[in-house]
Amino acid sequence: MTNMRKSHPLIKIINHSFIDLPAPSNISAWWNFGSLLGVCLTLQIITGLFLAMHYTADTTTAFSSVTHICRDVNYGWLIRYTXANGASMFFILLYFHIGRGIYYGSYTFMETWNIGVLLLLLVMATAFMGYVLPWGQMSFWGATVITNLLSAIPYIGFTLVEWIWGGFSVDKATLTRFFALHFILPFIITATAAIHLLFLHETGSNNPSGLNSDSDKIPFHPYYTIKDILGLLIMLMVLLTLILFSPDLLGDPDNYTPANPLNTPPHIKPEWYFLFAYAILRSIPNKLGGVLALAFSIVILALFPALHMSKQRSMSFRPMSQCLLWALVANLIILTWIGGQPVEHPFIMIGQLASISYFCIILILMPTTSLMENKMLKW
């Protein structure tokens, strides 16, 4: 009699994905982030579901309902802060996951990579709409500023903005639709992540050497299940430390003031994980130019397969490219810092220089360095 896990139509899928999956024997801890993102997404859906049971998507009661969740619902504060800080954790893991993909040349799996870029955009949209829901000052003004960017689109811009708002300003209709979309998007993300995994399993995982590992595979379970559980415990420890000791560390104090359309906060800024893109947006004096730079700063990830000029897949044996990648990481940290600063000297200049160098590193320096490394190795 065959093992049920190998014959049952449903269990067979799980078996081929997480148990008997042949995995390279040399993948490092950098390959843990995919499973951690899956856990994070599950956590977000569960906490979000419980929050939705108590939240009201109405401008007059939204802020009070969040207060009610924190004060009156059993462990409501825990659920609320897990959903808020879980989003931050999600982005930390996501940025590590993307960085790993760039370092080890995983973007050469075109379908997997492009679906990954789509996933990033979906997660960003979900996080943005979630930030609007508590209906604090930063929620309201963040929604106003970011949706208003679409008015830079020629001809249809203003119509599009009013269509998204459901009126002539960010109001009840906007909040209701943002809540509906914020609820449905994580399920769309789950389905997209399943497709992401499907395409990955067509080719098998990449590995630190960037070489074909078909001749040296080991079963996913128990080797990588145990390894992933270690990563999971570390992640949960970091997340719980954040939630239980400083839940508002990554938030904005302005969001504890109910939304007031008549009073603009002194510094409107998004959550920390969008600050790098926000800095690029602000560094260009022209509105349409800024919006295009903002969009391109994220969509540029889709160009990585086309910009890969090296004869080697991974950066493991390419020290010059490694230096450039770390320069890019430092550059993104500078952009994140600048995004949270007021628009004044010297921050404007630093932001503009960091924005230029961001695009230069990716579009010019990295491909050129790859070609140079090929030459040095006489390839």
From Swiss-Prot:
Family per UniProt? Belongs to the cytochrome b family.
By its UniProt entry, which InterPro entries does this protein fall under? Cyt_b/b6_C (IPR005798), Cyt_b/b6_C_sf (IPR036150), Cyt_b/b6_N (IPR005797), Cytb/b6-like_sf (IPR027387), Cytochrome_b (IPR030689), Cytochrome_b_C_euk/bac (IPR048260), Cytochrome_b_N_euk/bac (IPR048259), Di-haem_cyt_TM (IPR016174)
UniProt keywords, alphabetically: Electron transport, Heme, Iron, Membrane, Metal-binding, Mitochondrion, Mitochondrion inner membrane, Respiratory chain, Transmembrane, Transmembrane helix, Transport, Ubiquinone
Report if keyword Transmembrane is assigned.
Answer: yes
One Pfam family assigned to this protein is Cytochrom_B_C
Q: Which GO terms describe its cellular component?
A: mitochondrial inner membrane; respiratory chain complex III
- CDD domains under this entry? cytochrome_b_C, Cytochrome_b_N
Q: Which residues bind heme b b562?
A: 83, 182
Q: Which organism is it from?
A: Trinomys iheringi
| Name of the protein this chain belongs to | Cytochrome b
Q: Where does heme b b566 bind?
A: 97, 196
> Binding residues for a ubiquinone, per the UniProt record?
201
Q: What does this protein do?
A: Component of the ubiquinol-cytochrome c reductase complex (complex III or cytochrome b-c1 complex) that is part of the mitochondrial respiratory chain. The b-c1 complex mediates electron transfer from ubiquinol to cytochrome c. Contributes to the generation of a proton gradient across the mitochondrial membrane that is then used for ATP synthesis.
- From the record, give the transmembrane residue ranges: 33-53, 77-98, 113-133, 178-198, 226-246, 288-308, 320-340, 347-367
Q: Which residues form a coiled coil?
A: none
Q: Which GO terms describe its molecular function?
A: metal ion binding; ubiquinol-cytochrome-c reductase activity
This chain is encoded by the gene named MT-CYB
Q: What else is known?
A: Heme 1 (or BL or b562) is low-potential and absorbs at about 562 nm, and heme 2 (or BH or b566) is high-potential and absorbs at about 566 nm.
Q: Where in the cell is it found?
A: Mitochondrion inner membrane
Q: How does it sit in the membrane?
A: Multi-pass membrane protein
The free-text cofactor remark is: Binds 2 heme b groups non-covalently.
Q: Give the quaternary structure.
A: The cytochrome bc1 complex contains 11 subunits: 3 respiratory subunits (MT-CYB, CYC1 and UQCRFS1), 2 core proteins (UQCRC1 and UQCRC2) and 6 low-molecular weight proteins (UQCRH/QCR6, UQCRB/QCR7, UQCRQ/QCR8, UQCR10/QCR9, UQCR11/QCR10 and a cleavage product of UQCRFS1). This cytochrome bc1 complex then forms a dimer.
Which cofactor is essential here? heme b
- GO terms classed as biological process: mitochondrial electron transport, ubiquinol to cytochrome c
